[in-house]
Amino acid sequence: MIRLDTYETEKYWEEGVVTAEASAFFITPDGLAVTNCHSIEDSVRATATLSTGDVYPVESVVYYDAGIDIAVIRISKTALKGHDTTEFACLDIAPSGTGDLRTGDTVYAIGNPLGLGLAVSAGVISATERQVDRYELPCVMSTADISEGSSGGALLNVYGQAVAVTTGAYVYGNSMYLAVPIDPVLSADLTGEGQSLSAVSEALRVEA
């Protein structure tokens, strides 16, 4: 699991002023990680901090879709702080994505709530396809707690496979936490070098 720190300007980057914190998780050992699209918008730089304390720079964005709020980023193996690595520990994606989820299934949300570090919460699926205005795909709704900073974390099934990406909650409800299906990542082309964070942020501003 990753704590994702983003920087809105080069000046903030140079001064070490973090603009926002979010979560992300590796899906390949060579550094591809999933997060929310909204977690990287308006940023020109970002870093990934692991539970070991090692910090790695985000190199590029290889896939993003604001409509479904998912992005795949590439993280360097060369550390800014700590130890370089040859590979990252990663999560498996459920082969069917959300296809096998059923209401009442046990799930686990892992992320970086409030920037405090790795945390895990358990809950059940309360809806497998909840329509939410801001998302182009129906969301998974569960009772697994998430907080600010958890955006971009993983929602796992009982086999430890990622089925969705935690993204938000109904403010005026209780235990109504939302995650966007990870299914689009299964079919996305993740082979390219990708674009810089600043280029993607500019494109998202134009699209808005």
Task: Name each model-derived stretch.
Residues 9-17, 63-68, 78-85, 127-141, ...:
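Gly/Ser-enriched beta-turn/beta-hairpin loop segments
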Residues 25, 146-166:
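Catalytic nucleophile loop of clan PA
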Residues 58, 77-87, 113, 162-208:
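C-terminal cap/linker of serine protease catalytic domains
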Residues 2-4, 45-52, 105-112:
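Short conserved beta-strand and strand-loop elements enriched in small hydrophobics
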